[in-house]
Regions:
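Soluble or luminal CAZymes and related metallo-dependent hydrolases
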Residues: 40-47, 73, 133, 174-179, ...
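Surface-exposed cleft-lining segments at the edges of enzyme active sites
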Residues: 33-37, 65-67, 154-173, 197-204
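Charged, glycine/proline-rich intrinsically disordered loops and linkers
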Residues: 101-125, 162-170, 239-260
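Short, solvent-exposed loop/turn segments at secondary-structure junctions
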Residues: 24-27, 66-67, 96-98, 144-147, ...
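N-terminal, active-site-proximal structural segment of metallo-dependent hydrolase catalytic domains
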Residues: 1-135, 283
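Metal-dependent phosphoester-hydrolase catalytic domains
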Residues: 5, 146, 151, 203-208, ...
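Active-site beta-strand/loop signature of hydrolases that rely on acidic residues for catalysis
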Residues: 18-24, 47-74, 141, 183-186, ...
Length: 320
């Protein structure tokens, strides 16, 4: 093991950054593909914290996180994950707030449309001070300094879809939920770069529309750009969508000063490997794509098993 591998800060100084994306299913432990009871509390030895720490990621995108929800012990899971990962720079964006369901558990509040963003200072934008409202969303964690943050709410699809739900037989007709995206401009050893974390709709077509919206929303941020998340899209479709022509009247793809026009304009899959279901991966919903980076730049691609979630994390390193 080299010094940079033993010390994440040394790895960053050596110009290598370890990225990971992980749909954590609110930290729910799994056994043989079925969810099991979540242990109370979320201390240093909680399953979610252990799983996140095991990835040793410098930049980590997390989906399906709970914040102050009863089902996960009223824990701020983004904060717990950031502490476990040793990532002092982080943001959590609520896809939706929740209230008690008539039959138990939690249900989205349909009237709540405000995007709430929280970070290490314990205050929330869009919600004023931290008001203790339970929610569900995504997070972006970083060991590298962050120059700039950006957050966006993604509206749900207007139609339901039959889905396979962990722990249930057959298909369950489910309505889509609001989603969120986070973007950050990070300070790398070779200069700034942009990371985008997102979780897209499970409704075909609607998730494509969301991905195009995110592409346009981040077009003015500096390259290289790395996009991580559970896209609910398989195969080459995410890359094809990102490389499709810009919408009429909108310039989305721009040249960065330190990259060739071809590299800056073309999005590449950096890893093609199944991530779902975790106990026997067959399809890839979780992706890392980039532009402004060579298509063969990624090293150390892995989907390590963890004790939580029905997804595997996707991990890789890039020279940044």
């Amino acid at each position: 093991m080299t010094a940079s591998e033993a010390d994440p800060r040394g790895r960053a100084r050596a110009g290598r950054v370890r990225f990971a994306t992980f749909n954590v299913l609110h930290g729910r432990p799994m056994r043989d593909g079925r969810p099991v009871a979540l242990p109370p509390g979320c201390g240093p030895d909680a399953p979610l914290v252990r799983a996140v720490a095991s990835l040793d990621a410098d930049v980590l995108a997390l989906q399906e996180l709970d914040r102050l929800q009863e089902r996960s012990g009223r824990v701020d899971q983004a904060r717990a994950a950031a502490e476990g990962a040793g990532a002092p720079y982080w943001r959590y964006a609520s896809a939706f707030t929740t209230g008690p369901a008539p039959t138990g558990g939690q249900t989205p509040e349909p009237h709540e449309r405000a995007l709430r963003v929280y970070g290490p200072d314990r205050t929330g934008s869009g919600a004023g001070v931290d008001d203790g409202v339970p929610s569900h969303g995504i997070a972006l964690l970083s060991r590298l300094p962050v120059r700039h943050w950006r957050a966006r709410r993604l509206a749900p699809a207007p139609v339901p879809m039959p889905l396979r739900t962990p722990g249930r037989r057959g298909l369950t007709v489910s309505w889509d939920q609001p989603r969120a995206a986070l973007a950050a401009v990070l300070e790398g050893s070779r200069g700034p770069f942009t990371v985008v974390a997102l979780h897209l709709s499970f409704v075909p077509g609607w998730n494509v529309r969301q991905l195009l919206d995110v592409r346009a929303w981040t077009a003015d941020l500096p390259g290289p750009r790395i996009l991580l998340g559970d896209l609910n899209l398989t195969g080459v479709l995410p890359r094809a969508v990102l490389n499709s022509p810009a919408r009429k009247g909108r310039t989305e793809l721009r040249r960065t000063p330190d990259a060739s026009p071809r590299l800056s304009r073309t999005w590449h899959d950096l890893a093609r490997t199944p991530t779902y279901p975790a106990h026997r991966p067959l399809v890839q919903f979780d992706h890392v794509l980039a532009n402004g980076i060579a298509p063969d730049a990624a090293t150390g691609v892995a989907t390590p098993p963890t004790e939580v979630s029905d997804h595997r994390p996707l991990v890789l390193e890039l020279p940044l």
